[in-house]
Curated annotation (Swiss-Prot):
The gene is CCDC22. This is Coiled-coil domain-containing protein 22. It is found in: Endosome; Cytoplasm, Cytoskeleton, Microtubule organizing center, Centrosome. Belongs to the CCDC22 family. GO terms for cellular component: centrosome; endosome. Residues 218-243 are annotated as: Disordered. The modification Phosphoserine is found at residue 410. The lineage of its organism: Eukaryota, Metazoa, Chordata, Craniata, Vertebrata. GO terms for biological process: endocytic recycling; positive regulation of ubiquitin-dependent protein catabolic process; protein transport. The keyword Cytoplasm applies. Residues 323-369, 447-484, 564-595 form a coiled coil. Its main location: other. InterPro entries: CCDC22 (IPR008530), CCDC22_CC (IPR048348), CCDC22_N (IPR048349).
Length: 595
């Protein structure tokens, strides 16, 4: 048994039970250790059931009984064949505990040893619950949509799908180092989740916005993009002048072909410098004048299509100018634009800081307003009460008598209502007690009938076993009868038996005749009869001794079984739990009386 207990304890440790090293047998298991072992095994076998049970034994007796009943019900649901109740967990005996833990250990999964370190973790329990839920869904048969019940329509239909409705999102575009995230609000923008009124459309809106950003990012590397001027301004200085001129000419031709290829009115374009000047008008007193590069760029983009085409053809002629002047003008213009952009960013950051400060001040002012409103309401109530008291002062005695009458009438009304409530409460309590008594009687009757049904099942099984055994004996006798020779007659056996009986009778008659004639023969016959009688007594004594020895062994086994059940320790635990339960009941009664 000790070797089997060690193997069982090793299985419990693999399932996640913290069994102390000094515990080597099930006899040393405490109530707390039994509850923890059963809960850990249930969590590994069925995470959906075990996750709702606590491995720690609560302090309150009512909570202990509820936990023990839940464990018993969970084990019975798994198919435990024996009787199981709360006493098997709170006051365990060694044989019952061994049967229960062996039953649970047999149902542990084969890979429990591999997941020994993670079997008691919340992540492992969650993964097992997800896997069991997926297996349950895969085990369900597929039903056509027109034949589905409402429950199947919810499980297998399209109830969890949402239509793809996207809304336009506006995100802050800041270039400073303290740039906010996409989900945060800008100085004049709401947060991204608040811009979508429907919660179901938030994911669709974010997906569409990110797809647009991805398309814009991948399209920037193509010829004819809008930022070709910025890329040409960042060309390395060591590159050949002819290659730079050819690349610039190619970009200009491609851009003009895309812009003026279709007939129609020319589009009006705003200069980047004008936009930045409009943003930075409040921060800078004067607007910087455009450089020669800016004016030439503006003039280039505002020409007619014929002039643009002519200018494209004249690019090789004008490209003979000194390249250094062009690069210097571009660098100067870029530097001025950077300064303006930094000024705009600085102004935006200052405005954001001011808005945050104003928001905090606004919250404080609103809080003070609410507090002042509450204080005003309280003062109005106190003023109203004092004004009513002042109105009653001129005729104080009469008003006091009226108030006394009102108080007495209110007290009488309360007493009357209490009497009416008592009239309604008494029959309801009587009916409740009657129904509770009927329920108890029904439960007793159902338990009695259940016991009778179980006894009938056992008797049916015993009768079936007896019938099966007799059927086997009958088949054996039939086979022996078939093996006997067919020519043997029953008459020969009967005659032989009659001859033996006749010989015995003759021998008795001869012995009686000899005993009458000879005294020695008579004494020998008497001694033989006494010897037969003593032998029968000796045989009876030996049989009684064997029966007593069997009873002694049975009693020893019962004593060992009772010692294994730890009856005395369980009785001590029951007494302690009874005292704790009485203390809890007394505390609850005291609270009820105080309430």
């Amino acid at each position: 048994m000790e070797e089997a207990d060690r193997i069982l304890i090793h299985s419990l440790r693999q399932a996640g039970t913290a069994v102390p090293p000094d515990v080597q047998t099930l006899r040393a298991f405490t109530t707390e250790l039994v509850v923890e072992a059963v809960v850990r095994c249930l969590r590994v076998i069925n995470p959906a059931v075990g996750s709702g049970l606590s491995p720690l034994l609560p302090l309150a007796m009512s909570a202990r009984f509820r936990l023990a009943m839940s464990l018993a019900q969970a084990c019975m649901d798994l198919g435990y064949p024996l009787e199981l109740g709360y006493q098997n967990f709170l006051y365990p005996s060694e044989p019952d505990l061994r049967d229960l833990l062996l039953f649970l250990a047999e149902r542990l999964p084969t890979d429990a040893s591999e997941d020994a370190d993670q079997s008691a973790g919340e992540s492992a329990i969650l993964l097992r619950a997800i896997g069991s839920r997926i297996r349950d869904h895969l085990a369900l048969p597929w039903v056509p949509p027109l034949l589905r019940t409402p429950k199947l329509q919810y499980l297998q239909g399209s109830a969890h799908q949402k239509p793809f409705h996207a809304s336009r999102l506006v995100m802050p575009e800041l270039s400073s180092r303290g740039e906010s995230r996409e989900f945060q609000a800008g100085p004049l923008l709401l947060p991204v989740p608040a811009q979508v009124p429907q919660p179901a459309a938030r994911a669709a809106s974010l997906l569409e916005h990110h797809a647009i950003q991805l398309c814009q990012h991948t399209g920037r590397d193509r010829a004819g993009d809008e930022d070709w001027g910025h890329r040409t301004s960042r060309l390395p200085a060591q590159e050949d002048t002819r290659a730079q001129r050819q690349r610039l000419q190619k970009h200009l031709a491609e851009h003009l072909r895309q812009t003026w290829g279709r007939p129609g009115p020319p589009q009006q374009a705003r200069d980047l410098g004008e936009v930045l000047q409009a943003w930075g008008a409040g921060a800078r007193p004067g607007t910087p004048k455009g450089s020669r590069f800016t004016h030439s760029k503006k003039f280039t983009f505002h020409l007619e299509p014929e002039a643009q085409a002519a200018q494209v053809s004249d690019v090789p002629a004008t490209s003979q100018r000194p390249e250094q002047d062009t690069w210097a003008a571009q660098e100067q213009e870029l530097e001025s634009l950077r300064e303006q952009l930094e000024g705009v960013n600085h102004n935006i950051e200052e405005v954001e800081a001011n808005m945050k400060t104003l928001g905090i001040n606004l919250v404080q002012v609103e809080t003070e307003c609410r507090q002042s409103e509450l204080s005003i309401v309280e003062r109005e109530q106190a003023l109203r009460l004092k004004s009513q008291a002042v109105e009653l002062l001129p005729d104080g005695a009469a008003n006091l008598a009226k108030l006394q009458l009102v108080v007495e009438s209110s007290a009488q009304r309360v007493i009357h209502l209490a009497g009416q409530w008592e009239k309604h409460r008494v029959p309801l309590l009587a009916e409740y007690r009657h129904l509770r008594k009927l329920q108890d009687c029904r439960e007793l009757e159902s338990s009695r009938r259940l016991a009778e049904i179980q006894e009938l099942h056992q008797s049916v099984r015993a009768a079936a076993e007896e019938a099966r055994r007799k059927e086997e004996v009958y088949k054996q006798l039939v086979s022996e009868l078939e093996t006997l020779p067919k020519d043997v007659s029953r008459l020969a056996y009967t005659q032989r038996i009659l001859e033996i009986v006749g010989n015995i009778r003759k021998q008795k008659e001869e012995i009686t005749k000899d005993a009458k004639k000879d005294d020695a023969v008579r004494k020998a016959y008497k001694y033989l009869a006494a010897l037969h009688e003593n032998c029968s007594q000796l045989i009876q004594t030996i049989e009684d001794t064997g029966t007593i020895m069997r009873e002694v062994r049975d009693l020893e086994e019962q004593i060992e079984t009772e010692m294994g059940k730890k009856t005395l320790s369980n009785l001590d635990k029951i007494r302690e739990d009874y005292r704790a339960l009485r203390q809890e009941n007394a505390g609850l009664l005291g609270r009820v009386r105080e309430a």
